[in-house]
Amino acid sequence: MTDECQPVAVSRRICAPAREIFQVLADPVRHPQFDGSQMLRGAGSATVISAAGDVFVMKMYYAAIGDYEMNNHVVEYEHDRRIGWEPAAGRGHPDYDPGDPAAARWGQRWSFELTPDGPDATIVTEIYDCSAAPEHERLAIDNGSIWAEAMAKTLERLDALCARQGNQPSPA
């Protein structure tokens, strides 16, 4: 019998409208600025996420692997409300198979939900769901709970980034 795996969710109230926060989340170039895991090194291109089905590449670093890339398949996209992707191993990752790139998708999903809390604030929830991953992989990462601290740090950094952005004059 296997234990049921529940998604890990961390929330924070950020004093910025959902629209502004979503703009940051939909721009992979900005992801290293708020990444709480400190694994993200940069985006593979300057393309902004605009729909489910998009794929964006992130340059990553993990001590056991070194430098590598992840191909992130956007599976959830509701403008200003929800965005989510499923990562797959990319170039430099030991699980990457250029002949079958879809084979390196592990059943993990990262997403952000934005719930307006008045006109100038938003409850942001980051969700990590590994329920579709093989059981041995879920157990190796304690059903995703190992990410909770990094997720809290991500939201803290996103809050600070949006606060700085909110103090900038709007482009004309």
Segments and roles (model prediction):
Residues 1-47, 51-52, 172:
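Hydrophobic ligand-binding cavity/cleft-lining segments
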Residues 5-13, 18-19, 55, 69, ...:
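Intrinsic-disorder/low-complexity, polar/charged segments enriched in Ser/Thr/Lys/Arg/Asp/Glu/Gln
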Residues 20-25, 31, 56-58, 74, ...:
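Hydrophobic pocket/interface hotspot
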Residues 36, 61, 88, 127:
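Surface loops and adjacent helix of pleckstrin homology
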Residues 44-46, 57-61, 70-72:
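Short secondary-structure capping micro-motifs at structural edges
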Residues 62-121:
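Hydrophobic-ligand binding "helix-grip"
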Residues 103-106, 123, 127-172:
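A conserved amphipathic terminal alpha-helix motif
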